[in-house]
Amino acid sequence: MARVTVEDCIDKVENRFELVLLASHRARLISQGSSITIDRDNDKNPVVALREIADETLSPDDLKEDLIHSLQKHVEIDEPEPDPASLLAAGGNASASGDEEEDAPEAVTFDQMSEEELLAGIEGLVPPEKSDDY
């Protein structure tokens, strides 16, 4: 049964190594209690996962994204970029205020932090959780 299922899955996921990763991830999800989308027919979890991929009840792209998300330790949060129209409006007001500022080179300034503020920030940090990776 599994051989026929794998041959059906190669049409959906061309790389057989990626197919193994996706099917094993899905089989682990099933063993953790995730609901299955097809009839089990007394098959084991890896065979059920392969049949789900072959029957296209699950998208391989969705499985791939879920696998990547499960392996990530640090998730980056995309912060919204400032609106270009508001930047132009703010820049236009500054240049209209005086012509002398336009000729002078623009000075780059950074936020200044005192040593006490830095130490208070460091003391407020929470140590990372211990993991078995080390």
Curated annotation (Swiss-Prot):
Keyword Transferase recorded: yes
Domain of life: Bacteria
Region called Disordered, residue ranges: 77-108
Key words, A-Z: DNA-directed RNA polymerase, Nucleotidyltransferase, Transcription, Transferase
Sections of the chain in a coiled coil: none
Enzyme Commission no: 2.7.7.6
Catalytic activity: RNA(n) + a ribonucleoside 5'-triphosphate = RNA(n+1) + diphosphate
MF annotations from Gene Ontology: DNA binding; DNA-directed RNA polymerase activity
Residue ranges with Low complexity bias: 85-97
GO BP field: DNA-templated transcription
GO CC term, one of those recorded: DNA-directed RNA polymerase complex
Entry-linked SUPFAM superfamilies: RPB6/omega subunit-like
InterPro entries tied to this protein: DNA-dir_RNA_pol_omega (IPR003716), Pol_omega/Rpo6/RPB6 (IPR006110), RPB6/omega-like_sf (IPR036161)
Subunit structure: The RNAP catalytic core consists of 2 alpha, 1 beta, 1 beta' and 1 omega subunit. When a sigma factor is associated with the core the holoenzyme is formed, which can initiate transcription.
Alphabetical list of PANTHER family matching this protein: DNA-DIRECTED RNA POLYMERASE SUBUNIT OMEGA (PTHR34476:SF1)
Main function: Promotes RNA polymerase assembly. Latches the N- and C-terminal regions of the beta' subunit thereby facilitating its interaction with the beta and alpha subunits.
Family of this protein: Belongs to the RNA polymerase subunit omega family.
NCBIfam families (alphabetical): rpoZ
Name of this protein: DNA-directed RNA polymerase subunit omega
